[in-house]
UniProtKB/Swiss-Prot annotation:
TM annotation in the entry: 1-21, 43-63, 87-107, 112-132, 137-157, 171-191, 213-233, 241-261, 273-293, 301-321, 324-344, 366-386, 407-429, 457-477, 482-502, 582-602
Organism for this UniProt entry: Sus scrofa
Chief location category: mitochondrion
Protein name, as recorded: NADH-ubiquinone oxidoreductase chain 5
Keywords: Electron transport, Membrane, Mitochondrion, Mitochondrion inner membrane, NAD, Respiratory chain, Translocase, Transmembrane, Transmembrane helix, Transport, Ubiquinone
One function term, GO molecular function aspect: NADH dehydrogenase (ubiquinone) activity
Gene Ontology annotations for the cellular component aspect, listed alphabetically: mitochondrial inner membrane; respiratory chain complex I
The keyword NAD is assigned to this record: yes
InterPro entries according to UniProt: NADH_DH_su5_C, NADHpl_OxRdtase_5_subgr, ND/Mrp_TM, NU5C-like, Proton_antipo_N
Function of the protein: Core subunit of the mitochondrial membrane respiratory chain NADH dehydrogenase (Complex I) which catalyzes electron transfer from NADH through the respiratory chain, using ubiquinone as an electron acceptor. Essential for the catalytic activity and assembly of complex I.
Reactions listed under catalytic activity: a ubiquinone + NADH + 5 H(+)(in) = a ubiquinol + NAD(+) + 4 H(+)(out)
Gene giving rise to this polypeptide: MT-ND5
Length: 606
C-alpha cells in the first residue's frame, strides 16, 4: 500500500481512538475533552499530507482490502474512494471540527456529561467521514444513517426540554422521508445494474432513467433541508450551539448536496432531474432568505442563512456545475461555523439570551466577537477577496451565463441580495445602538478556548478561499469573456442588499410599533408551512379517528344497533299484535255510545 493510501487510512483510524478509550480511566476524568480535541487536531495535520500528494500527482485511488459479504452475485467490500471530493473535504471537516471542539470545551464546561458529548461529536465526525469516503452505496448508506442518528442524539442533548425533544424527533422524521428515496434508489440500482459500487453504476448506466435520480434528489432534499422538507433545520437550533455549528457547517446538512455531487456523472445527462434540482434549489434559497429577514432568534437567522446557501448549492448542481457546488461547501464551512460560534459567544455571555431585540451595543463589550461576526457576515454575502467570494461569485457568474431558467436566476439573485440584508440586521441589532440587556450581566470573552477557536476560523474565513481556489485543479482557469455588468452582478446585488437593510434599520429605529402586516407574518411564520403541515393533517387524522371510534363503535353499535334497535323492534311488534291502544277515554265513550244506541233501539220497538 503506497503512502497516500496508508496516511489516509491512518487519518480515519486515529479518529476511532477516543471511542475505543471510552472504557479507560481517561474517559472518567476531565481530561477526555482535551484528549479528543488533540486527537482531531493530529488527524487534521496528518490529512494534509495526502492532500498535498494528491495536489502534486492528481492521482485518485480506491482502497478495497476487506471483503464484507456476497449477496447472490453482488460482492460487498469495505472500500474507500480517495478522489478529488473526499481528499479535499476531509481536511476542511477536520479543521472546522477541531475548532468547534475547542469552543465546546468553553461552552459546555459546566455540563456534567461533557465526556459523552465529546464522544457523540467524534462519532458524528466519523460517520461523516464514512459517508464522504464510501465507494459503494451500502457503505454510503451506513454513513448516511449514522449522521442522522447522531444528529438526533445531539439535537436532543438537553432532553429535559420539550422543545429539544420535539426538534430531535422532527429532524429524524424529515430525514426518514428522504431515506425512502435513498433506499428506493439502492433497490433500483441493485435490480437493474446488479451493483452497488459507484464505478460499476456509472459504467452500466450511461443514460440513467428518472426514477433512481429522483429518489436521490428526495434523499438530498431531506438531508439538506430543501423546500418541503426544510422545517427541521431551524428547529434543530434547540440543540447546544456547538452542535448547530458542526451540523450546519461541514457535516450533516451538506451530506445531501454531497450525494448529488457524487452522482453527477448520471445527472449530467438527465435534463429533467437537473431542472428539478435547479428549481428546488432556487425556491429554497429565496424562501429561506425571506424567512430569515423577520426572525428574532440569532441562531435561527444563521440557520436560515445555511438553508439559503444549501439552496444555492442545489442551483449550482442544477446548472451542471458540481465541482463549483463542492467548492462552495468547502468555503461555506469556515465562515458558517464561525458565525454559529460568535452567536454562541453572545448567547453564553448574555445568560442564554437569543433574541436580537434584547441585545445591542455589544461592540464595546465584545470587540473580538464583533470583528469575527462582521467578517463572517461579509464572507457569507460574498464580499470580494474573503473566502465566500471565491465560490459565490463564480456561482452567480455561472448562473448568469446559463440559459436554463431565467426565473431560477432571478430568484437566486434576490436571495443573494437578501443575504446581505439579514446579515446587516444581525450586526445592527446585536452590536450597534444602545444596550437593551440587563446591566448586571457579566460579559467576558477573554477565555483562550473561545478566542483561539474563533481566531482559527477567522483566519480561514479570510485566507482559505484564496489558498484553496489557487491550489486545486484546474490550476489554470481559462479567461472568460462577459460584459462588465454581468461580471459585477453578484457585487451589485449584495451592495443593494446592504443599502436596503441600512435604510430600513435607520428608518424603523425611531418608528412607533405598528401591527405586523400579512407579509411580515408570512415571513415570520415561515410561510405558515410548519403550522399547516404539522397541525392540520395530525388534527384531521386524530379527529377522524376519534369520530370513527365514538360514532362507529359507541354511538352506532353500542347504542343505536343494540339497545335502541331492540326496543324499537319490540315496540313495533307489540303494536302490531295488540288491539288496545291505551286510550281509556275513547274506550269508555265507545261503551257509553253502544249502550245508548242499544237502549234507543229497544225502546223504539216497544
Amino acid at each position: 500500500m503506497n503512502p497516500f493510501a496508508s496516511l489516509t487510512l491512518t487519518t480515519l483510524i486515529i479518529l476511532t481512538i477516543p471511542i475505543m478509550m471510552s472504557n479507560s480511566n481517561i474517559y472518567k476524568t476531565n481530561l477526555y475533552p482535551n484528549y479528543v480535541k488533540t486527537t482531531v487536531s493530529y488527524a487534521f495535520t496528518l490529512s494534509l499530507v495526502p492532500l498535498l500528494m494528491f495536489m502534486h500527482t492528481g492521482q485518485e485511488m480506491i482502497i478495497s482490502n476487506w471483503h464484507w459479504m456476497t449477496l447472490q452475485t453482488v460482492e460487498l467490500s469495505l472500500s474507500f474512494k480517495m478522489d478529488y471530493f473526499s481528499v479535499m473535504f476531509i481536511p476542511v471537516a477536520l479543521f472546522v471540527t477541531w475548532s468547534i471542539m475547542e469552543f465546546s470545551m468553553w461552552y459546555m464546561h459546566s455540563d456534567p456529561f461533557i465526556n459523552r458529548f465529546f464522544k457523540y461529536l467524534v462519532l458524528f465526525l466519523i460517520t461523516m467521514m464514512i459517508l464522504v469516503t464510501a465507494n459503494n452505496l451500502f457503505q454510503l448508506f451506513i454513513g448516511w444513517e449514522g449522521v442522522g442518528i447522531m444528529s438526533f442524539l445531539l439535537i436532543g442533548w438537553w432532553h429535559g426540554r420539550t422543545d429539544a425533544n420535539t426538534a430531535a424527533l422532527q429532524a429524524i422524521l424529515y430525514n426518514r422521508i428522504g431515506d425512502i428515496g435513498f433506499v428506493l434508489s439502492m433497490a433500483w440500482f441493485l435490480t437493474h445494474s446488479n451493483a452497488w459500487d459507484l464505478q460499476q453504476i456509472f459504467m452500466l448506466n450511461n443514460e440513467c432513467p428518472n426514477m433512481p435520480l429522483i429518489g436521490l434528489l428526495l434523499a438530498a432534499a431531506g438531508k439538506s433541508a430543501q423546500f418541503g422538507l426544510h422545517p427541521w433545520l431551524p428547529s434543530a437550533m434547540e440543540g447546544p450551539t456547538p452542535v448547530s455549528a458542526l451540523l450546519h457547517s461541514s457535516t450533516m446538512v451538506v451530506a445531501g448536496v454531497f450525494l448529488l455531487i457524487r452522482f453527477y456523472p448520471l445527472m449530467e445527462t438527465n435534463k429533467l432531474v437537473q431542472t428539478m434540482t435547479l428549481c428546488l434549489g432556487a425556491i429554497t434559497t429565496l424562501f429561506t432568505a425571506l424567512c430569515a429577514i423577520t426572525q428574532n432568534d440569532i441562531k435561527k437567522i444563521v440557520a436560515f442563512s445555511t438553508s439559503s446557501q444549501l439552496g444555492l448549492m442545489m442551483v449550482t448542481i442544477g446548472i451542471n456545475q458540481p465541482h463549483l457546488a463542492f467548492l462552495h461547501i468547502c468555503m461555506h464551512a469556515f465562515f458558517k461555523a464561525m458565525l454559529f460560534m460568535c452567536s454562541g459567544s453572545i448567547i453564553h455571555s448574555l445568560n442564554d439570551e437569543q433574541d436580537i431585540r434584547k441585545m445591542g451595543g455589544l461592540y464595546k463589550a465584545m470587540p473580538f466577537t464583533t470583528t469575527a461576526l462582521i467578517i463572517g457576515s461579509l464572507a457569507l454575502t460574498g464580499m470580494p477577496y474573503l473566502t465566500g467570494f471565491y465560490s459565490k461569485d463564480l456561482i452567480i457568474e455561472a448562473v448568469n451565463m446559463s440559459y436554463t431558467n431565467a426565473w431560477a436566476l432571478l430568484m437566486t439573485l434576490i436571495a443573494t441580495s437578501l443575504t446581505a440584508a439579514y446579515s446587516t440586521r444581525i450586526i445592527f441589532f446585536a452590536f450597534l445602538g444602545k444596550p437593551r440587556f440587563p446591566p448586571l450581566v457579566l460579559i467576558n470573552e477573554n477565555n483562550p478556548l473561545l478566542i483561539n477557536s474563533i481566531k482559527r476560523l477567522l483566519i480561514g474565513s479570510i485566507f482559505a478561499g484564496f489558498i484553496i481556489s489557487n491550489n486545486i485543479p484546474p490550476m489554470t482557469v481559462p479567461n472568460t469573456t462577459m460584459p462588465l455588468y454581468m461580471k459585477m452582478t453578484a457585487l451589485i446585488v449584495t451592495i443593494m442588499g446592504f443599502m436596503l437593510a441600512l435604510e430600513l434599520n435607520n428608518t424603523t429605529y425611531y418608528l412607533k410599533f405598528k401591527y405586523p402586516s400579512q407579509t411580515y407574518k408570512f415571513s415570520n411564520m415561515l410561510g405558515y408551512y410548519p403550522s399547516i403541515m404539522h397541525r392540520l393533517p395530525t388534527y384531521h387524522n386524530l379527529s377522524m379517528s376519534q369520530k370513527s371510534a365514538s360514532s362507529l363503535l359507541d354511538l352506532i353499535w353500542l347504542e343505536t344497533i343494540l339497545p335502541k334497535t331492540t326496543s324499537f323492534i319490540q315496540m313495533k311488534m307489540s303494536i302490531m299484535v295488540s288491539n288496545q291502544k291505551g286510550l281509556i277515554k275513547l274506550y269508555f265513550l265507545s261503551f257509553l255510545i253502544t249502550i245508548m244506541i242499544s237502549m234507543t233501539l229497544f225502546n223504539y220497538h216497544e
